[in-house]
Amino acid sequence: MATKEKLQCLKDFHKDILKPSPGKSPGTRPEDEAEGKPPQREKWSSKIDFVLSVAGGFVGLGNVWRFPYLCYKNGGGAFLIPYFIFLFGGGLPVFFLEVIIGQYTSEGGITCWEKICPLFSGIGYASIVIVSLLNIYYVIILAWATYYLFQSFQSELPWAHCNHSWNTPQCMEDTMRKNKSLWITLSTKNFTSPVTEFWERNVLSLSSGIDDPGSLKWDLALCLLLVWLVCFFCIWKGVKSTGKVVYFTATFPFAMLLVLLVRGLTLPGAGAGIKFYLYPDISRLEDPQVWIDAGTQIFFSYAICLGAMTSLGSYNKYKYNSYRDCMLLGCLNSGTSFVSGFAIFSILGFMAQEQGVDIADVAESGPGLAFIAYPKAVTMMPLPTFWSILFFIMLLLLGLDSQFVEVEGQVTSLVDLYPSFLRKGFRREIFIAFMCSISYLLGLSMVTEGGMYVFQLFDYYAASGVCLLWVAFFECFVIAWIYGSDNLYDGIEDMIGYRPGPWMKYSWAVVTPVLCVGCFIFSLVKYVPLTYNKVYVYPTWAIGLGWSLALSSMMCVPLVMVIRLCQTEGPFLVRLKYLLTPREPNRWAVEREGATPYSSRLAVNGALMKPTHIIVETMM
């Protein structure tokens, strides 16, 4: 067949098979048509609903408490070099890919891959396993923030002094530390600060280890319940309600971050903190860990490989120009991370000056920044109660809208597996309540006296960078080398009216897979077993459990491949060709409704469906 005819054949196939019919949503259900009720998949009320939902989904805690610390730790301004390489070579291409395939197929994170390439539908299942585990422990941070917020409504912040029942004789107030020589003498005696004791002895009541869970912390359990109730009532009506809630939850944190930035820049010592944040150390680029941190931060901060962005994209109208908005949202996300560093390190610079210590001694990441370093800083400011309330409201809202999006992505992906059952009546709402309840009950293990050890185990393994890189590699591989980047570009052109520049398809084909593989290998080579505070060493069984959590998502891809091949009849190569071929929407819709599995029938109207790209063509 001539090359020109072959390309035309592929375009015709692509148009006939995956392009939705006029007046129908992609994935139209035949039984709805028979009843005279064309399916109306829920759509965003306006473009701004989608933009704010995505912004709220990926502008979260990681932008405020992880990026600034990584920037300082990995060479300051020099860290921006690997960061931008991973941003343009991996983060933005995968982010846009997930949004656009959701919009193109009008399916969630699992069923979109069933349409595109049934053999690799395990990609969707892997994403859902990751986001399900993430939903269990991410919300614990919000429970802690809620507890701190309630404790902030006092004339004197409870972590400012050492005169409470949970304090020990080793507690030393920060006023004593202003005398640097005295502090150097006392620090050799293992004195602790009131804010550290409040965190470890009051909030966590930290036990001796993960094998000593202790009793349930009822105050944290109630805070966790409150957060889950807020989450449920904000998403239970679908994107119509979520799209309105994010008008507040996605915008108000930016206003508060701006206030904190202005306040931080006006504090004494702010200049030293910012210099410490951005001072470039080019020699750090020789360390592979710097590149690993840059890659994993990009994937975390863009909330990709979780199925959430695909689910949000599936509610877009077919002709919506998501390419333009995805690029703008990418700028917003990375810009927020960068500006957050000024807000955080200006305050840490002030804090270091007040204590008479180096900034490196007060710089923290993750929970250490949010619940130790920053609460300590506000006790040194005028109006500490006001700044504490402001900070924890911002932290809570940043986390809440991310949680909304992650749970919505999880629910959408699972509901799309059984739409005729779960979309009837109030079944979707009941299903959301069930998922929230299960996640809450599992999360109770993290609000015990030993819960912090469980939380760290989930955070280190369950949704680790290794898992996200694994999923991202297969997403790009399937689109570029099986379905075909040009075929997807045809669909994009049909949706937005033009073809994006070649940067995206080159990234999907080469750049992103190479970055993912390199970062994945170095992550395994540089792997260090988990510890808590660099002191407590996790037992072997806990490390094994952590790797089981990581593998539970990664194994979905090969496991589903084997299951699909076993379920399909015929010679091996024939089965392989069929499973590498995009599914015809209406026939696939019948299968997902419980009819005779179409995967057991190898022909469509007596002939195999035409292949789409290189790998399938070489087999034929």
Swiss-Prot record:
GO biological process: amino acid transport; neurotransmitter transport; sodium ion transmembrane transport; taurine transmembrane transport
Spans traversing the lipid bilayer: 50-70, 78-97, 122-142, 218-236, 245-262, 298-315, 327-348, 381-400, 430-448, 465-485, 506-525, 545-563
Catalytic reaction annotation: 4-aminobutanoate(out) + chloride(out) + 2 Na(+)(out) = 4-aminobutanoate(in) + chloride(in) + 2 Na(+)(in); taurine(out) + chloride(out) + 2 Na(+)(out) = taurine(in) + chloride(in) + 2 Na(+)(in); beta-alanine(out) + chloride(out) + 2 Na(+)(out) = beta-alanine(in) + chloride(in) + 2 Na(+)(in); hypotaurine(out) + chloride(out) + 2 Na(+)(out) = hypotaurine(in) + chloride(in) + 2 Na(+)(in)
Record's keyword terms, sorted: Cell membrane, Glycoprotein, Membrane, Neurotransmitter transport, Phosphoprotein, Symport, Transmembrane, Transmembrane helix, Transport
Post-translational note: Taurine transport activity is down-regulated upon Ser-322 phosphorylation by PKC.
Localization annotation: Cell membrane
Ranges in the topological domain labelled Cytoplasmic: 1-49, 564-620
GO cellular component, one term: plasma membrane
Entry protein name: Sodium- and chloride-dependent taurine transporter
